[in-house]
Amino acid sequence: MVQSTVTVNGVKVASTHPQSAHISIHIHQKSALEQLLGAVGSLKKFLSWPQARIHYGQLSLGVTQILLGLVSCALGVCLYFGPWTELCAFGCAFWSGSVAILAGVGTIVHEKRQGKLSGQVSCLLLLACIATAAAATVLGVNSLIRQTSVPYYVEIFSTCNPLQSSMDPGYGTVRYSDDSDWKTERCREYLNMMMNLFLAFCIMLTVVCILEIVVSVASLGLSLRSMYGRSSQALNEEESERKLLDGHPAPASPAKEKIPAIL
């Protein structure tokens, strides 16, 4: 304000003159770069689940699957030292063990990364592990039923029977007789021990396949529950953000403006 003195009828009167005032109003709007970064962040949030704490129970199930797969492959190698059975013919110990190892690795990777794609791949591997382990269990049970049957034992122990001397004029083969009964008894004892060992390997493989099914089902249940919980959490966060935006609307402006006003 500027003061001046004015004389009115011989009386000095102080008068004031208004001074121009400038008021600057700034309206800020996000730049194009900020909007681009926000869009990239939204896309990344859509493609991945929100971060959560690591479930060590899920990790332990993954490690258990890997160990069961290794044991299955080792038992498959041992089975090839025995008589030929369905387990050896189909090689179920190897493909069921390999799928179990892959499922365990997929579970561990998903628990570390916690992504949507890794979760779907992990669930598919777990389903494949359940299917292969179930097929191997069926083959193992059929093999056990056959190995515990009486005709199978008679066929195996017939190799220890004493050979009778005979001459076949058509083929010219000769079989020599062995009168020592103790050798026959000793052969049957060793053969019985080997058959029991082979039967134990088959039982262990069947049990391992059953354990693979149990562990895979448990891991699949935990994975589905975790995925459902994370999706619900993401929906709740989006709803909360929407409520906040509705409560505090942002002003719409084409660009940053500076409006001078003179009073």
Swiss-Prot record:
Tissues/organs with expression: Ubiquitously expressed with higher expression in lung, liver, kidney and colon. Expressed in cerebellar granule cells.
Renumbered residue ranges of the record's region Disordered: 239-263
Alphabetized UniProt keyword annotations: Differentiation, Membrane, Nucleus, Phosphoprotein, Transmembrane, Transmembrane helix
Chain positions found as Phosphoserine: S231, S240, S253
InterPro entries per the UniProt record, alphabetical: CD20-like, TMEM176A/TMEM176B
Annotated knockout phenotype: Mice exhibit abnormal development of the cerebellum and severe ataxia.
Cellular component aspect of the GO annotation: nuclear membrane
Residue ranges of the TM segments: 61-81, 89-109, 121-141, 197-217
Function description: May play a role in the process of maturation of dendritic cells. Required for the development of cerebellar granule cells.
Name under which the protein is recorded: Transmembrane protein 176B
Gene name as annotated: Tmem176b
